[in-house]
């Protein structure tokens, strides 16, 4: 008997009806609506460790982790206690506080960044970093990569995530907006290339390098499914600085997840600026950007590039971030544990898919993993065009099979899942059993 048979979704259905009456689409972030997989989104009532409990009382083994922040697991006691202690002193001051200094010092220590500035989201972090790069260089064009998602600022909603659009013929890097409401004039300042195409990047920089303020990239892509960079591509990225462009690593997803120094540490990167979010706030709304002092000192009030925020450095969010990073720093073996779990999960999923006769290609790095429903060798999906060849209907059927068996997977073919410290042997066994049954329900 499946979870869907023992726990009807009446409460979630009723909440979804109410939500649609007052909120566009009934959700506050589009992927939560289950549009690409069908069915009723689960309204969550509580979370603990590796598990979620929905409004109807059904319990799910969670592989979303609030889309990345919950690397320690949900409601971790150290984080909860730190927030409770901070709460006793007030919720927001609109003034400097000691905790923001302490969290900045931790980030500097763990990442090597020379300066850090806090904001309230990953979108704010990338938006601010690009404004800073333009102010520092005096240039206006930026370069991003097809399928890389950097938040929902107008200039970044250009061929972002699943919003793939055809490149304009004859104009290297030209692209169109991924969303209504983004003027073409904004999109015209964003040049888009294929991820993992070093030749195209070299060609663009040779052609227009003196116009480029910044090149922004995800070291590991997560919003087109997990895409892993090649060494040649990483080398080409670092060459953009020869043209005076600022190299910005968007580590909102990978920061503190792939290592204590994020993808920068794992992949031996050397960006000028980095953007963080998710884990850095321990589950509360925090973003940050930082890097070279000579660039960061252009930020107001030190320099001429304005950026501000009412809730930047919020004491509750800072407390959660400090507690999370302290736990990670105190447990350096955690990253090996997460990687081993992901490797065993990938191997088990591969075997289950083969036994069911379902074609899949699995990408994973550290605690991030995507199962692409397509007939290709594992690790061979390297750019958005390859990811887009996946069978989304087959994925949706598999997702529903998992959900019915109590596994809460990312509700999109083009997303990463996230493994936490709370995932152990019982969770791995339960996942592989449910996945095998769900694969049997996918029509070849």
From Swiss-Prot:
It is found in: Cytoplasm. One of its GO terms (cellular component) is cytoplasm. It catalyses: (S)-4-amino-5-oxopentanoate = 5-aminolevulinate. Its main location: cytoplasm. One of its GO terms (biological process) is protoporphyrinogen IX biosynthetic process. Pfam families: Aminotran_3. Its cofactor is pyridoxal 5'-phosphate. The keyword Isomerase applies. The modification N6-(pyridoxal phosphate)lysine is found at residue 278. The keyword Signal does not apply. Its EC number is 5.4.3.8. Keywords: Cytoplasm, Isomerase, Porphyrin biosynthesis, Pyridoxal phosphate. Pathway: Porphyrin-containing compound metabolism; protoporphyrin-IX biosynthesis; 5-aminolevulinate from L-glutamyl-tRNA(Glu): step 2/2. GO terms for molecular function: glutamate-1-semialdehyde 2,1-aminomutase activity; pyridoxal phosphate binding; transaminase activity. Belongs to the class-III pyridoxal-phosphate-dependent aminotransferase family. HemL subfamily. PANTHER family: GLUTAMATE-1-SEMIALDEHYDE 2,1-AMINOMUTASE, GLUTAMATE-1-SEMIALDEHYDE 2,1-AMINOMUTASE 1, CHLOROPLASTIC-RELATED. NCBIfam families: hemL, PRK00062.1. Homodimer. This is Glutamate-1-semialdehyde 2,1-aminomutase. It comes from Deinococcus radiodurans (strain ATCC 13939 / DSM 20539 / JCM 16871 / CCUG 27074 / LMG 4051 / NBRC 15346 / NCIMB 9279 / VKM B-1422 / R1). The lineage of its organism: Bacteria, Thermotogati, Deinococcota, Deinococci, Deinococcales. The gene is hemL.
């Amino acid at each position: 008997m499946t979870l869907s048979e023992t726990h009807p979704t009446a409460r979630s259905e009723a909440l979804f009806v109410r939500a649609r009456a007052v909120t566009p689409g009934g959700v506050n972030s589009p992927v939560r609506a289950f549009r690409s997989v069908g069915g009723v989104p689960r309204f969550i009532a509580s979370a603990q460790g590796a598990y979620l409990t929905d409004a109807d009382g059904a319990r799910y083994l969670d592989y979303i982790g609030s889309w990345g922040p919950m690397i320690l697991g949900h409601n971790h006691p150290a984080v909860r206690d730190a927030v409770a202690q901070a709460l006793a002193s007030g919720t927001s001051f609109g003034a400097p506080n000691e905790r923001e200094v302490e969290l900045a010092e931790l980030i500097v220590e763990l990442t090597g960044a020379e300066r850090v500035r806090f904001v309230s989201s990953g979108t704010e972090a990338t938006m601010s970093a690009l404004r800073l790069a333009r102010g520092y260089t005096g240039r206006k064009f930026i370069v991003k990569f097809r399928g890389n998602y950097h938040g929902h600022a107008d200039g970044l909603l250009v061929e972002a995530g699943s919003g793939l659009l055809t490149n304009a013929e004859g104009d290297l890097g030209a692209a169109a907006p991924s969303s209504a409401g983004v003027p073409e004039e904004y999109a015209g300042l964003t040049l888009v290339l294929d991820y993992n195409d070093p030749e195209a990047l070299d060609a663009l920089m040779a052609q227009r390098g003196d116009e480029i303020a910044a090149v922004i990239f995800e070291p590991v892509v997560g919003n087109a499914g997990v895409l892993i960079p090649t060494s040649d591509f990483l080398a080409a990225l670092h060459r953009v600085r020869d043209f005076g462009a600022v190299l910005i690593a968007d580590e909102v997803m990978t920061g503190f997840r792939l290592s204590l120094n994020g993808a920068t540490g794992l992949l031996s990167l050397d960006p000028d600026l980095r953007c963080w979010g998710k884990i850095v706030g321990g589950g509360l709304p925090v973003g940050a950007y930082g890097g070279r002092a000579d660039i960061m000192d252009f930020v107001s009030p030190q320099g001429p590039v304005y950026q501000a925020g009412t809730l930047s450095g919020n004491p509750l969010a800072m407390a959660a971030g400090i507690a999370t990073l302290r736990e990670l720093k105190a447990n350096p073996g955690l990253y090996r544990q997460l990687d081993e779990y992901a490797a065993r999960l990938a191997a088990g999923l591969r075997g289950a898919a083969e036994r069911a006769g379902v074609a899949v290609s699995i990408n994973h790095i550290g605690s991030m993993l995507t199962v692409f429903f397509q007939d290709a060798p594992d690790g061979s999906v390297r750019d958005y065009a390859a990811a887009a060849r996946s069978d989304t209907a087959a994925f949706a059927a598999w997702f529903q099979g998992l959900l019915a068996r109590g596994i809460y997977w990312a509700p999109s073919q083009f997303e990463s899942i996230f493994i936490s410290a709370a995932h152990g042997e019982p969770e791995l066994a339960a996942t592989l059993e449910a996945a095998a049954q769900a694969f049997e329900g996918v029509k070849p």
